[in-house]
A protein has these predicted regions:
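Short acidic (Asp/Glu) patches
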Residues: 63-71, 77-81, 101, 111-128
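Short, flexible loop/turn elements at secondary-structure junctions
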Residues: 39-42, 88-90, 99-104, 142-144, ...
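Conserved N-terminal entry element of GNAT/NAT acetyltransferase domains
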Residues: 2-41
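A short helix-loop-beta-strand connector motif used in the catalytic cores of GNAT acetyltransferases and
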Residues: 74-85, 108, 271-272, 282-288, ...
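Acyl-donor binding region in acyl/amide transferases
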Residues: 105-271
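C-terminal non-catalytic accessory extensions
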Residues: 287-332
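Short amphipathic alpha-helix that is part of the acyltransferase structural core
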Residues: 27-72, 83-102
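Aromatic sugar-binding interfaces of carbohydrate-active proteins
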Residues: 259-266, 271-292
Length: 332
């Protein structure tokens, strides 16, 4: 779909020079990898490599920006997003990453009254969300796993890539205990079978609703289903039973439920889903908004990704400079 060539890989030596100890967040629980956090201004070459890997991964599935490198104003602004990456020190490669922003740092655009978030063009936020939720929410975006680590040829490294990323997200909640929620999106691509997509979206809307109407898509993607089929497919209100039926139905179409959809559902049974918008500027991908309460993450995930983190070993100056102030405020 896109013809602009993606930039060449950035030298691993340049990235190593930028991934200094002050950016190290933690070691991963599995795979022998490391997690770093930084702003683009402090690691510009690493930011270029992130942009290359993001564009490569998103284009592979039919999304992407169409530019030679997926880096935008939200990455580069002085008050913009921070990057969280998993680094494989043995291979000298980035496995994957997120960009994130703490909600109490989000600026409100005076002209529009909207928060300066990457999702603000796709979703409308209720006054209650802006007042009661956003200040205690970590907004997540641009989740990716590098293409080489999506294949089994990388062995255990591939298996643990997403798990490693959640080690990083878990550490953020320990370092900034004022944060109570994760807000972000799951993506399905334009070429994903519409029938399978609608079954998945119906299931999410049924079992992970937003009764308070906190967030809604600016231009919602309609969920078109056959009522007779739905009654037969989901005859009860039992979430696990209906999930098994959904998984079977999607497999019969020849597909799998997207991994991130499965992964987020497994994090918390109380997840909220906010509907789906089409991102016209990103290859017409379908973006579904979600909210997960940190204290509702299931116990085994909390133990694995949150309780294993020792904040006394965190070295990231960028985090400590900003978070220690908040911790003092919470305690006072």
């Amino acid at each position: 779909m896109f013809t602009t060539p993606i930039i060449a890989p950035v030298s691993a030596d340049l990235i190593r020079q930028e991934l200094t100890p002050d950016k190290l967040l933690r070691a991963t629980n599995k795979g022998g990898n490391e997690i770093y956090v930084f702003h683009a201004s402090t690691a510009p070459e690493t930011m270029r490599e992130i942009g290359r890997l993001r564009e490569e991964a998103f284009r592979f599935y039919g999304g992407g920006t169409g530019r030679d490198c997926d880096v935008d104003e939200f990455d580069l602004a002085d008050d913009g997003y921070r990057q969280l990456i998993v680094w494989d020190p043995a291979e000298g490669a980035i496995l994957g990453g997120y960009r994130f922003m703490f909600g109490d740092e989000v600026q409100i655009d005076e002209a529009t009254g909207r928060p300066r978030l990457a999702t603000a063009e796709l979703f409308e936020f209720s006054p209650r969300f802006l007042t009661d939720y956003l200040p205690v929410t970590i907004e997540l975006g641009r989740s990716f796993v590098s293409l080489p680590y999506q294949s089994t040829r990388m062995g255990a490294k591939s298996l643990f890539a997403l798990d490693n990323l959640w080690d990083g997200l878990g550490a953020l909640t320990v370092l900034n205990p004022a944060m109570k929620y994760f807000y972000g999106k799951v993506t399905m691509y334009e070429d994903y079978d519409p029938h399978a997509r609608n079954l998945i979206l119906y299931f999410l809307d049924k079992h992970f609703p937003d009764p308070d109407h906190l967030v809604r898509p600016t231009d919602p993607l309609p969920i078109v289903v056959d009522e007779v089929e739905i009654r037969e497919l989901f005859p009860t209100d039992d979430r696990l039973e209906n999930y098994r039926a959904l998984n079977k139905a999607v497999r019969e179409i020849g597909l799998n439920i997207p991994p991130l959809v499965n992964a987020y559902m497994a994090l918390s049974p109380e997840m909220r889903v906010f509907g789906t918008a089409i991102n016209e500027d990103f290859g017409h991908v379908e973006e579904t908004g979600i909210l997960i309460a940190i204290d509702e993450i299931i116990p085994d995930k909390r133990v694995r990704h949150i309780e294993t983190f020792d904040p006394d070993k965190a070295q990231s100056d960028l985090l400590w400079t900003n978070i220690s102030r908040r911790v003092r405020l919470v305690k006072s």
